[in-house]
């Protein structure tokens, strides 16, 4: 890297989630990344929990200018509020709210990666009947999720559909998914073709 490019890169800040019980420390899940970024960049902290309530609480080093966020996923409306609150303090996140929403929600980014990502269909509904309509004409194994998350930790109960033409099993898995996501369901239902990947490591 040329020296001038290195200096420009060094001017970029980072902002991380703070620990929920000790807001002056970084969330332990991001400790190694925080320490690595701190070698060449100014790093601030903020309380994710306070932001969920609409309040911006900053800790750590003072930052201004272009900043990269590293932390937990946020719903687009929460990210937009975060972006605007930081901007009022002279801190500009590198991704605008529009860019964040586009690549956070599957319908926004899918066309950019079609052919490189598993085939997917989706709707904007929370209704089991509407979800079952998505299965028409589909064959093989699929994964059910919303626009952001699946319930992969409940693989056989609320995520993986071995044969989507099996109406009873498909209903069971999708219905479990909808009921368990509840109010946390983001957008609507997504069905993604299951790809059996090679295991490494």
Task: List each language-model region with its residue ranges.
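ATP-binding N-terminal substructure of ATP-dependent carboxylate-amine bond-forming enzymes
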Residues: 1-92
């Amino acid at each position: 890297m040329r020296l001038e490019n290195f200096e420009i890169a060094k001017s970029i800040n980072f902002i991380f989630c703070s620990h929920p019980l000790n807001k002056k420390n970084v969330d332990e899940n991001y400790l190694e990344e925080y320490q690595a970024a701190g070698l060449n960049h100014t790093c601030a902290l903020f309380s994710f929990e306070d932001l969920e309530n609409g309040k911006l609480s900053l800790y750590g080093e003072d930052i201004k200018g272009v900043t990269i966020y590293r932390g937990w996923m946020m719903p687009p409306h929460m990210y937009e509020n975060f972006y605007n609150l930081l901007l009022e303090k002279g801190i500009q996140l590198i991704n605008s709210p529009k860019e964040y929403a586009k690549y956070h929600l599957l319908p926004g980014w899918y066309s950019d990666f079609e052919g490189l990502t598993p085939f997917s269909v989706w709707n904007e509904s929370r209704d089991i009947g509407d979800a079952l309509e998505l299965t028409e004409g589909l064959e093989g194994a699929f994964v059910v999720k919303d626009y952001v998350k699946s319930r992969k930790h409940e693989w056989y109960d609320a995520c993986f559909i071995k044969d989507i033409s099996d109406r009873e099993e498909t209903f069971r898995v999708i219905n479990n998914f909808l009921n368990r996501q509840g109010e946390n369901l983001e957008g609507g239902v997504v069905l993604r073709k299951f790809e059996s990947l090679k295991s490494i490591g």
